[in-house]
Amino acid sequence: MSLLEQVSVSKKANIYFDGKVASRSVFLADGSKQTLGVVLPGEYEFSTSQGEVMEVTSGRFEVLLPESTVWQEFSEGTQFELAANVSFKIRNTAIAEYCCSYL
């Protein structure tokens, strides 16, 4: 979905990796939470505290999923799912954006 309706948005950004990754928390009418983020070129490692679905909304990422040794490419309109309490890596060569939905 390219448009989120009837939401509340946190004014304060979540800033990671010296400002190279930034996201905003979005709270939907049903009480669920998503984050919308921008990632500058680089390689980053993240950890999850709950299950997530990461949708690439612009650009592309290469992703090293948990327990994998092969980087996989995800481009605009694609997504990948992550379990709770895992670590994964992403890398990109140009600015990319994502929408993270929590399970």
From Swiss-Prot:
Domain of life: Bacteria
GO molecular function, one term: uridine phosphorylase activity
Reactions accelerated catalytically: a purine D-ribonucleoside + phosphate = a purine nucleobase + alpha-D-ribose 1-phosphate; adenosine + phosphate = alpha-D-ribose 1-phosphate + adenine; cytidine + phosphate = cytosine + alpha-D-ribose 1-phosphate; guanosine + phosphate = alpha-D-ribose 1-phosphate + guanine
Keyword check for Glycosyltransferase: yes
E.C. numbers: 2.4.2.1, 2.4.2.2
InterPro entries, alphabetized: Ppnp, RmlC-like_jellyroll, RmlC_Cupin_sf
Keywords carried by this UniProt record: Glycosyltransferase, Transferase
Pfam families in alphabetical order: Ppnp
Cross-referenced CDD domains: cupin_PpnP-like
Enzyme class: transferase
GO cellular component, one term: cytosol
Reported function: Catalyzes the phosphorolysis of diverse nucleosides, yielding D-ribose 1-phosphate and the respective free bases. Can use uridine, adenosine, guanosine, cytidine, thymidine, inosine and xanthosine as substrates. Also catalyzes the reverse reactions.
Family: Belongs to the nucleoside phosphorylase PpnP family.
Protein name: Pyrimidine/purine nucleoside phosphorylase
Organism in which the protein naturally occurs: Shewanella sp. (strain W3-18-1)
Lineage of producing organism: Bacteria, Pseudomonadati, Pseudomonadota, Gammaproteobacteria, Alteromonadales
